[in-house]
């Protein structure tokens, strides 16, 4: 569950390290974001000399959450951190690599590019 003011790690090589969620995009008054949801975030920490700078407003898709996610089979999956991948307006990732595992729910939400870049899909 990602809400406003939540800090997330960045799971790609776009240049940002930490994000803070400003808004969860969705229908109506979306308070919490789950895996596969798009958020508006501000970059709180960035690597020097990279295209994405600190205090820049970006779009990102949530790829890992500490809150357990229930699947239709009854199994639940939980990750060690909250993480997101920065995307452009078309929904494609800005980075060329994705670090760490991502959830299978991303494939259902048509983020196949992120799933193909990830080293492991759980």
Swiss-Prot record:
<keyword id="KW-0689">Ribosomal protein</keyword>
<dbReference type="GO" id="GO:0003735">
    <property type="term" value="F:structural constituent of ribosome"/>
</dbReference>
<comment type="similarity">
    <text>Belongs to the universal ribosomal protein uL14 family.</text>
</comment>
<dbReference type="Pfam" id="PF00238">
    <property type="entry name" value="Ribosomal_L14"/>
</dbReference>
<dbReference type="GO" id="GO:0006412">
    <property type="term" value="P:translation"/>
</dbReference>
<protein>
    <recommendedName>
        <fullName>Large ribosomal subunit protein uL14</fullName>
    </recommendedName>
</protein>
<dbReference type="GO" id="GO:0070180">
    <property type="term" value="F:large ribosomal subunit rRNA binding"/>
</dbReference>
<keyword id="KW-0687">Ribonucleoprotein</keyword>
<keyword id="KW-0699">rRNA-binding</keyword>
<keyword id="KW-0694">RNA-binding</keyword>
<dbReference type="GO" id="GO:0022625">
    <property type="term" value="C:cytosolic large ribosomal subunit"/>
</dbReference>
<dbReference type="InterPro" id="IPR005745">
    <property type="entry name" value="Ribosomal_uL14_bac-type"/>
</dbReference>
<comment type="function">
    <text>Binds to 23S rRNA. Forms part of two intersubunit bridges in the 70S ribosome.</text>
</comment>
<dbReference type="InterPro" id="IPR019972">
    <property type="entry name" value="Ribosomal_uL14_CS"/>
</dbReference>
<comment type="subunit">
    <text>Part of the 50S ribosomal subunit. Forms a cluster with proteins L3 and L19. In the 70S ribosome, L14 and L19 interact and together make contacts with the 16S rRNA in bridges B5 and B8.</text>
</comment>
<dbReference type="InterPro" id="IPR036853">
    <property type="entry name" value="Ribosomal_uL14_sf"/>
</dbReference>
<dbReference type="InterPro" id="IPR000218">
    <property type="entry name" value="Ribosomal_uL14"/>
</dbReference>
């Amino acid at each position: 569950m990602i809400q406003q003011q939540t800090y997330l790690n960045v799971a790609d090589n776009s240049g940002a390290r930490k994000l803070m969620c400003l808004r969860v995009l969705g229908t109506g008054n979306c308070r919490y974001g789950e895996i596969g949801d798009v958020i508006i975030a501000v970059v709180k920490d960035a690597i020097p000399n990279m295209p994405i700078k600190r205090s820049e407003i970006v779009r990102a898709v949530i790829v890992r959450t500490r809150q357990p996610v229930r699947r239709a089979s009854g199994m639940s999956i939980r990750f060690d951190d909250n993480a997101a991948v920065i995307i452009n307006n078309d929904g494609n990732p800005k980075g060329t690599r994705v670090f760490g595992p991502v959830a299978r729910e991303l494939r259902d939400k048509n983020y196949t590019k992120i799933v193909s870049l990830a080293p492991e899909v759980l």
